[in-house]
C-alpha cells in the first residue's frame, strides 16, 4: 500500500506541475506578442535609451559609394552627327562615413539633426585610380549651350568667342578626381561674370563637389516616443514641409523617412517611402519578395516600373515634367536649369529608344536594379544597393560652333551605387536582441504548453491503470468463488446414495 500511495502522490505532483506549465504557456501565448511589440517599439524609436539610437546616430555598417563612368569612345564622330559609343569605366570606390550632429529634441515629438558625410577613396576595391583620365561631355559647354539656346544671338556669339579663347571643347579629357570633386575652369569665371545666376558654384566645378565633407541639409523627423504611428517620418527638411521644384502639389510633397530606418511591423502590403535631397523628390519602393539575410528574415523592396515613368505612362508623374521618354526624370528644375536626367543605370526599365541611341549600353535587372532588404519587425535595413544614373541631354545649338552637328541624345555620364550590409558586432547584437530572443519566447510558449499537456496525462493514466487493477482483482475473486462452489457441488453429488449405487453397478460390470 505504501508504494501505491507514493506513486499516486508523484502522479498528482506531476499533474500539478503540468497544469502550471500549461497555464504559463497560455499566458505567454496571450502576452508574448504584446511584450515583443513593446520591446521593439522601445528599441527602434529615436531615443538615447533605445538599442538602435547609436546605430541611428552614426551608421556602424561599412557603406560604399561605387562610381562607374561612361567614357565616350568616338567624340569627334559624335560632333559630326554620328551615334555615341560609350565604354564603362570603374568602379571607383569610396568608403562613406556618416554621423549625425547638432541633434536637438523638440517638444512636438520630433528631433532635428544634420548628417555629416565624408568619402574616402578605396584603391583596393577600385578598378583604377583617381588619376585615371576619362573622356566625357564637357557639361559646362554642352549644358551651357542648351541654356543659351533661347538667348539673343549676340550672347551666343560672345559665348562662342569665349569658348575659343579659353580652349573649351564639347568633350573633355580629365581625371576621375577632377570630374567628381572639382577643377578650376576659366569658363566658370566667365559665366559667373556675365551670367551670374546661371551656375550655383563660384569656385571649382565637379559632379560630386557638394557631396564630400558636406551634408544634405537639416532634417526634422518624428521620434516615435509619443506617437508610434509617425516614427521616423520626415516633418521638415531645411525648415520646409514641402518643396517647390515641381509642378504639382503631389510631386512637391516630402513623404516617408530620411531613408535610413522605417516604421516596424511591416507586411507585404507595406511600401518604403523616403525623401532624397539629391534626387530632389520623394520616392517609393514596393515589396518584391521575402528573403533571409545572415539568418535574419527580411523583405526585399525594389523600385516599381512607375518610379521614373513619364506623365503619359503614369499620370501622377506629370508634375515632374517637362518629360522626355519614359524611364528618365528631368532634374533640371533643381539643378539650376542644367539638362540633367536621373534614371536607373544603362537606362534599365526605360524606353528602349534611350539605350538604342547610345552604343555600349546593356541594361539588365541583375546588375542595374536597386533594392533594400528590411527586417520587417523592426524596419531596420539589413542590406541595400541603391543605383542611379546621371545623364546629360546634348544637341547642336545654332550659333554656338562648339556643339557641331551633334544629334539630340540623352548621353549617360556616370552611374553610382550606394551599398552597405550589416555585419560584425552590430549584426550579432541585432540578431540576439531583436531576432533570437523573440524567437526563443515564441517557441517557449508552445514548449511549455505541450510539456504541460503531457504532464497532465500522468495522473490521468495512473488513475485509469489503478481502476483496471481493481477490476481485474474483483473479477478474479468472483471467478475463484464460482469455481469453489462448482467443485463442492460436484463432491456432494458423488457422496449421495444414488450416486454410490450407480458407481457400484458400474464397478460390477
UniProtKB/Swiss-Prot annotation:
The chain crosses the membrane at residues 12-32, 441-461. Its main location: membrane. GO terms for molecular function: amyloid-beta binding; apolipoprotein A-I binding; apolipoprotein binding; high-density lipoprotein particle binding; high-density lipoprotein particle receptor activity; lipopolysaccharide binding; lipopolysaccharide immune receptor activity; low-density lipoprotein particle binding. Induction: Both isoform 1 and isoform 2 are up-regulated in response to adrenocorticotropic hormone (ACTH). GO terms for biological process: adhesion of symbiont to host; blood vessel endothelial cell migration; cholesterol catabolic process; cholesterol efflux; cholesterol homeostasis; cholesterol import; cholesterol transport; detection of lipopolysaccharide. Residues 33-440 are extracellular. It is found in: Cell membrane; Membrane, Caveola. N-glycosylated. The six cysteines of the extracellular domain are all involved in intramolecular disulfide bonds. Residues 1-11, 462-509 are cytoplasmic. Glycans are attached at residues 102, 108, 116, 173, 212, 227, 255, 288, 310, 330, 383. Keywords: Cell membrane, Disulfide bond, Glycoprotein, Lipoprotein, Membrane, Palmitate, Receptor, Transmembrane, Transmembrane helix. Disulfide bonds join 251-384. It is a multi-pass membrane protein. Expressed primarily in liver, ovary and adrenal gland, and, at lower levels in other non-placental steroidogenic tissues, including adipose tissue, mammary gland and testis (at protein level). Isoform 2 is expressed at lower levels than isoform 1 in liver, testis and adrenal gland. At the mRNA, but not at the protein level, isoform 2 is the predominant isoform in testis (80%). Belongs to the CD36 family. The C-terminal region binds to PDZK1. PANTHER family: SCAVENGER RECEPTOR CLASS B MEMBER 1, SCAVENGER RECEPTOR CLASS B TYPE-1 SR-B1. Receptor for different ligands such as phospholipids, cholesterol ester, lipoproteins, phosphatidylserine and apoptotic cells. Both isoform 1 and isoform 2 act as receptors for HDL, mediating selective uptake of cholesteryl ether and HDL-dependent cholesterol efflux. Also facilitates the flux of free and esterified cholesterol between the cell surface and apoB-containing lipoproteins and modified lipoproteins, although less efficiently than HDL. May be involved in the phagocytosis of apoptotic cells, via its phosphatidylserine binding activity. This is Scavenger receptor class B member 1. It comes from Mus musculus (Mouse).
Amino acid at each position: 500500500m505504501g508504494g501505491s500511495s507514493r506513486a499516486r502522490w508523484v502522479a498528482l505532483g506531476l499533474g500539478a506541475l503540468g497544469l502550471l506549465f500549461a497555464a504559463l504557456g497560455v499566458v505567454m501565448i496571450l502576452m508574448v506578442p504584446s511584450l515583443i511589440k513593446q520591446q521593439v517599439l522601445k528599441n527602434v524609436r529615436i531615443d538615447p535609451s533605445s538599442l538602435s539610437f547609436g546605430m541611428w546616430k552614426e551608421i556602424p555598417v561599412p557603406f560604399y559609394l561605387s562610381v562607374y563612368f561612361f567614357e565616350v569612345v568616338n567624340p569627334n564622330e559624335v560632333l559630326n552627327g554620328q551615334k555615341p559609343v560609350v565604354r564603362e569605366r570603374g568602379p571607383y570606390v569610396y568608403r562613406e562615413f556618416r554621423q549625425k550632429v547638432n541633434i536637438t529634441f523638440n517638444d512636438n515629438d520630433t528631433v532635428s539633426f544634420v548628417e555629416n558625410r565624408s568619402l574616402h577613396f578605396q584603391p583596393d576595391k577600385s578598378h583604377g585610380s583617381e588619376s585615371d583620365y576619362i573622356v566625357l561631355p564637357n557639361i559646362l559647354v554642352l549644358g551651357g549651350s542648351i541654356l543659351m539656346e533661347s538667348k539673343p544671338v549676340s550672347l551666343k556669339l560672345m559665348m562662342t568667342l569665349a569658348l575659343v579663347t579659353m580652349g573649351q571643347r564639347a568633350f573633355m579629357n580629365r581625371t576621375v578626381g577632377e570630374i567628381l570633386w572639382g577643377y578650376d575652369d576659366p569658363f566658370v569665371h566667365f559665366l559667373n561674370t556675365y551670367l551670374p545666376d546661371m551656375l550655383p558654384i563660384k569656385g571649382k566645378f565637379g559632379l560630386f563637389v557638394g557631396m564630400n565633407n558636406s551634408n544634405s541639409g537639416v532634417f526634422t523627423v518624428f521620434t516615435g516616443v509619443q506617437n508610434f504611428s509617425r516614427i521616423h517620418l520626415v516633418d521638415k527638411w531645411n525648415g520646409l514641409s514641402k518643396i517647390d521644384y515641381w509642378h504639382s502639389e503631389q510631386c512637391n510633397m516630402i513623404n516617408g523617412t530620411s531613408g535610413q530606418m522605417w516604421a516596424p511591423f511591416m507586411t507585404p502590403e507595406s511600401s518604403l517611402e523616403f525623401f532624397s535631397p539629391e534626387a530632389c523628390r520623394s520616392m517609393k519602393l514596393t515589396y518584391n519578395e521575402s528573403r533571409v539575410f545572415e539568418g535574419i528574415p527580411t523583405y526585399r523592396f525594389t523600385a516599381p516600373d512607375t518610379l521614373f515613368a513619364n506623365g503619359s505612362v503614369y499620370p501622377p508623374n506629370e508634375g515632374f515634367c517637362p518629360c522626355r521618354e519614359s524611364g528618365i526624370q528631368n532634374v533640371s528644375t533643381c539643378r539650376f536649369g542644367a539638362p540633367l536626367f536621373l534614371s536607373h543605370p544603362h537606362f534599365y526599365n526605360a524606353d528602349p529608344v534611350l539605350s538604342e541611341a547610345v552604343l555600349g549600353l546593356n541594361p539588365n535587372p541583375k546588375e542595374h536594379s536597386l533594392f533594400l532588404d528590411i527586417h520587417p519587425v523592426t524596419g531596420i535595413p539589413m542590406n541595400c544597393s541603391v543605383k542611379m544614373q546621371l545623364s546629360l541631354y546634348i544637341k547642336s545649338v545654332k550659333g554656338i560652333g562648339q556643339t557641331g552637328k551633334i544629334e539630340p541624345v540623352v548621353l549617360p555620364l556616370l552611374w553610382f551605387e550606394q551599398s552597405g550590409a550589416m555585419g560584425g558586432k552590430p549584426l550579432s547584437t541585432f540578431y540576439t536582441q531583436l531576432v533570437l530572443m523573440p524567437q526563443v519566447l515564441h517557441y517557449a510558449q508552445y514548449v511549455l504548453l505541450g510539456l504541460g499537456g503531457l504532464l497532465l496525462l500522468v495522473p490521468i493514466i495512473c488513475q485509469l491503470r489503478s481502476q483496471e487493477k481493481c477490476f481485474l482483482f474483483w473479477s478474479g475473486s468472483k471467478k475463484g468463488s464460482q469455481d469453489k462452489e462448482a467443485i463442492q457441488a460436484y463432491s456432494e453429488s458423488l457422496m449421495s446414495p444414488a450416486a454410490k449405487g450407480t458407481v457400484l453397478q458400474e464397478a460390477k460390470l
